[in-house]
A protein has these predicted regions:
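Extracellular beta-strand/beta-solenoid scaffold signature
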Residues: 18-31, 53-72, 87-104, 119-127, ...
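Right-handed parallel beta-helix
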Residues: 2-13, 34-49, 72-91, 105-123, ...
Length: 217
């Protein structure tokens, strides 16, 4: 799937009980090579009752998955714009990929912009397996205090991604039991820029910075 625009659709996915890995919208690049030009905009994604436990698969409003055991795979040109996301559990906009740098083939030209995220208890925007992603002009607020005591989460953060720019965002009211910062440059991420953002009323404060996980460097 490439050269596609998903525009102006309202999605909900609420079952009787919570279901691990439940999503509103999933984009999958797996053993598919390079997919180009995917736009997700003007959507309302709400009421996705996934698992509240990350290790169980969690749940997301928008999930971008990139894996390639046989063929290196990625998305080149992904825009997530002007969406309203609320009451999606565990997460809002979530990328997943391999963290193995021996097979590094990152998503490129990723823009996450002008999204409103409300009443999401876990991670707001997670950039994983990308190079040069821009996350800007997003508002994340009113994170409900419903995560289990074991769960860590934060507002906007890259994981195993390089040269991420996080700017002109507002994150407020994060209430996770662990972390709960507005912003984070997480594990195995190089060249992250966090600038001109607003953070307030988050249990963990403004920002968290992690190293490569195996050293103090």
């Amino acid at each position: 799937m490439e050269h596609i625009i998903i525009d102006g659709i309202e999605i909900s996915n609420k079952g009787i009980e919570r279901l691990e890995a439940r999503t509103g919208l999933t984009i999958l690049a797996e053993d598919s090579g390079e997919l180009k030009n995917i736009v997700i905009k003007n959507m309302v994604i709400r009421d996705v009752n996934g698992s509240l436990v990350k290790s169980d698969g969690g749940g997301s409003a928008i999930l971008i998955r990139k894996f390639g055991e046989k063929i290196k795979s990625r998305i080149n040109g992904l825009q997530i714009l002007n969406n309203h996301i609320y009451r999606t559990e565990r997460n809002a906009i979530n990328f997943r990929a391999s963290a193995n740098r021996d097979k590094w083939y990152p998503n490129l030209n990723v823009i996450v912009k002008n999204n409103l995220i409300e009443k999401v208890p876990g991670d707001g925007i997670v950039i994983f397996g990308c190079d040069g992603a821009i996350v800007e002009h997003n508002t994340l607020r009113d994170f409900p205090d419903i995560l289990p005591d074991s769960e860590a989460a934060a507002g906007i953060w890259p994981f195993s991604s390089d040269n991420t720019i996080i700017q002109f965002n507002e994150v407020s009211g994060h209430k996770a039991k662990w972390d709960a910062q507005g912003y984070d440059s997480d594990w195995n991420s190089v060249g992250t820029i966090i600038q001109n953002n607003y953070s307030h009323d988050n249990y963990g404060g403004f920002v968290l910075v992690c190293n490569a996980g195996a050293s103090y460097g």
